[in-house]
């Protein structure tokens, strides 16, 4: 059993610390940091990086994850210059944790069936708990609260 959670960010939000180690910031999304809890229970992690806009090639990365608080992440050896500072500039948000990945395997994902997409503007309201903006009940599985 493994967690599967979507993550996206500006180019470089997943940092290469060395040949076998990656790190990325974990922000408050749904308010409960579910991904962090899931990784603490089961540290196996699988990631796929897809280039939808130019080559449509992907990269699979599988390994084990450790959850670090921001101070632990800042003390890592081989930290790329500005890594933690750059993470703070993403929409004015600060990471709640960092995920450190020990890479066990990585391989290319063929571009044959990956669609080529075009970029569209999308307004994002960071840090909101408004269900309409988050889309948290998109499939209507949670009963609507009674109207007053």
Model features per residue range: what roles?
Residues 1-148:
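Binding-site signature for planar aromatic cofactors or substrates
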